UniProtKB/Swiss-Prot annotation:
Glycosylation sites: N56, N120
Name of this protein: Dirigent protein 12
Superkingdom, natural source: Eukaryota
Cellular compartments annotated: Secreted, Extracellular space, Apoplast
Self-association state and partner proteins as the record states: Homodimer.
Tissue: Seed coat specific expression.
GO terms, biological process: lignan biosynthetic process; phenylpropanoid biosynthetic process
Amino acid sequence: MTNQIYKQVFSFFLSVLLLQSSTVSYVPKSFDLKKPCKHFVLYLHNIAYDGDNAANATAATIVKPLGLGDHSFGELIIINNPVTLDQNYLSKPVARAQGFYFYNMKTNYNAWVAWTLVFNSTKHKGTFTIMDANPFGLQPARDLSIVGGTGDFLMTRGIATFKTKLTQGSKYFCVEMNIKLYECY
């Protein structure tokens, strides 16, 4: 009987010791928000399909606005936009932005963005996802969340600061994306 009690006490202390050692040995990865582990500036080029430019279009409206205001509320756009290292649309793309955005405010222009930057260049291979609100009608510079990735950007997190550099009516725009990754593996 006493032998059985010793076994139970020993098992209990061993379990507590193992549990404590596993929690003590886990140290979360720290990162400095002042110094990103990767930083680069890219330019996204969006050419909207207007019924006549099927060969050049990189974005298409899938759901038309419902007429609930003057700010395209309810419009859903699918994209496959080239991303370059400079503002020139004819520059060689280093990535493609693939995904969608939709307008979600009646009182001002605001788009909710969900797209993945797909890299296939000599410098970077992999993807990361940008997902957040883009209040371009309210702010000249907007911070959007980078919420994960693959390849060279495996499980990365960071911020993409968007600045609209050029617009040509509703058919073309160029956005500067200042990418700062704070968690790199």
